[in-house]
């Protein structure tokens, strides 16, 4: 093939015409020290706080310490291949996560990347993990209940939409079980649930996901998992990522329930990062801003006023105590930030009282306004009965000769305690809770043997569902026990008691 000189020159001219000069400008620094998941980087003068930095091999880091001559950066991923002298690029992005409906039903890591093997998540929208909490003007007070399906909680420490209610207790007292039950009970309630697992074993998280799938709860849930094997920065980041995902739904007028399981491990991860970054330690070696770590997260839970969309985020943070010590640093911090706490006791748990809620130490500071009237009608008496029972039970240990009134109170208290027991993954709709508690506080269980209370409860609920559904419907729709409903309910209890032996 022979090319004439003029053809060659025309081909070269075409190539010159097509040529586009492209200059890629990137701010590049140099690693001067690396180790323990922390890198010191020199030369990135315009770097922002919490900006993502790109290390060789695609590993990402987050700038936390902006010092005079270098940047302290935490590495979010494997760092053994990073060495002194490596280039580090600025991305210009503050750390953000994907948000939207595409995440529902998925298990993701704190960066929003799927870890459930179900393929990529198709969403265009991203949100920064950090956001300033809604102000006073944009909020509305808590008035709508968020039913957990657990009698002891919905009756005595009620949770409202937009509330922060702490679940606190030692290890192995059923904290996660309470949270998972609350998620399962949101089926059909139009609530998006987000379960954030911080520092849990991968097998534990897999168990929770299987439970949610088995009860059809993954259809409206997102699981954000930072397992125990992950680097500390990912454990620190996970709650903020979950909250950012929830805020997308809240801003679109939806109700969201977020479980942070648990914030003790997030505080530990933050302590590890801070000490490695050489920040000065404070009490229990935590950095001085560990209170702000949790307050800025939990303040993002809110109920928005209708003109701002009317959505809500309800937060159930979990804190693990050591030997029931509620006065340690992190527990006292989170108790002071939240609107109440559900305290779970080891002794109650071991004695078979499940959920192991300590009625004396548990409180809901705003949820009472959100309780439906029917529950208020029966639960007011319930708290009083239990308080008197605890007082008398302590007193009765010293003397055997008790008068009839005291004996009757002790008997009723024992039955009330029994009626508040509930199996795992068996949440009750609120109207069924009301009728069951009604039987206890109105004295209908006084002549039922203590060991038959559970059987009575199961039988009575089935009887009400099949034969007296109109009473349950009336309580559900009217949200109170009107005199005519009351009379029907008493008649129904009497009718069932005749058949129960």
UniProtKB/Swiss-Prot annotation:
Its EC number is 7.1.2.2. ATP binds at residues 169-176. It catalyses: ATP + H2O + 4 H(+)(in) = ADP + phosphate + 5 H(+)(out). GO terms for molecular function: ADP binding; ATP binding; proton-transporting ATP synthase activity, rotational mechanism. Belongs to the ATPase alpha/beta chains family. Produces ATP from ADP in the presence of a proton gradient across the membrane. The alpha chain is a regulatory subunit. This is ATP synthase subunit alpha.
